[in-house]
Every structure is written in structure tokens, then in C-alpha cells.
Amino acid sequence: MNEKANAKCACGCSLVKHTDLIKKAEAHGRFNVVCKDKDGKIKWQDTIDNVVTTLGKNLALDTFLAGSGYTVTGPYMGLISSVSWSAVAAADTMGSHAGWTEAGITNAPTYTTRKTCAWDAAATGAKALSAALVFTMTGAGTVKGCFLVYGTGAVTTVDNTDGTLYSAGVFTGGDKVVADTDTLNVTYTASL
């Protein structure tokens, strides 16, 4: 009896372990704006995904990581006018932002003061305003966007150039016309 058996077996296995787990923190912010007329009816709503300026990032890092006591001045929120508009840039500062002007006293639309931000506790990598900030228009015009200023010298006075510009941005849906007595209800969420 001649029996032959040829047994063949092939088996493969591989294990790949990803050792370069990287988390990247980038500063982002989003303004949500609702415009209401004098009777409280919604006229329009839009969002702004903003530019966090280089100086704003630097102040945030110095504040977060300095290891000493620090009391924040501000932040205060203001509005960007369509007057003399060209662009928002990461290199903008409160003293030098040639691509845009602040709405308020000199440039339409007009309102009385920048608004003071009050925050909820941070959660899931984000920090949001605890309530919408309300801007009541005292004169008609076209609003382009919003900005945040804080740090040493920052104040609620419209057109003041002190403090550090943290962020600025324009509406995703284009310019927005507002009338005298309209209100802009603005929320903001910052995330890393």
C-alpha cells in the first residue's frame, strides 16, 4: 500500500500598533447672530467662523501657561462695519486692522458700547457665553461681523484701540443690513 499525503497549511497574521497618536489643539470660535426688529420678530440669522489672531493666541497661551495669578480684563464684543471693508487677518491687532473698521460711533451701524462677555464653564473642549449679548442699534447701516478684545487696556468704549484683539470674523451669508432699534443677539463659543 502506497499512500502519500501532502498536507499544506498557510496562516498569516499581522498586528499594527499606531504609536503616533497626536492631538492637535487649534483655537476656533463661532459667533451666532440673530437680528430682531423693534417688535421682536426675527429678520435674519447667520454664523461667523472667526479668525483667532496671532496676538490673541499668544495672550491666551501666556495666560493659560504662565503659572501666575491673572485676572482677565474683558473680553468685550464689538461689531464690524461694512465701511472701508477688505479683510480680517491673523496679523490684525486692535491698533492696526487696516482691512476693517468697528461699527459704532464713527462707522454705521451705530450702537452704544461693546458688550461684556460672561462665560459658562468649559466642557468638551469648548467654552460658550452664558447668555446672548444684545446690541441695540441706534442708527441704521450694514454690519459685516463681530470681534472680541481682551487683556490689559481693553474697555467697552467703541473705537478704543487698547487691549488685544482675540478674534474677528464676518458673516458666512454676506453683509447684513440693520435698522435703527433692531437688536443683534450674539452668542460665541470658543473651542480647542
What are the residue ranges of the model-derived segments?
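Small cysteine-rich, disulfide-bonded extracellular modules of the LU/uPAR three-finger superfamily
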Residues: M1-K144, Y150-L192
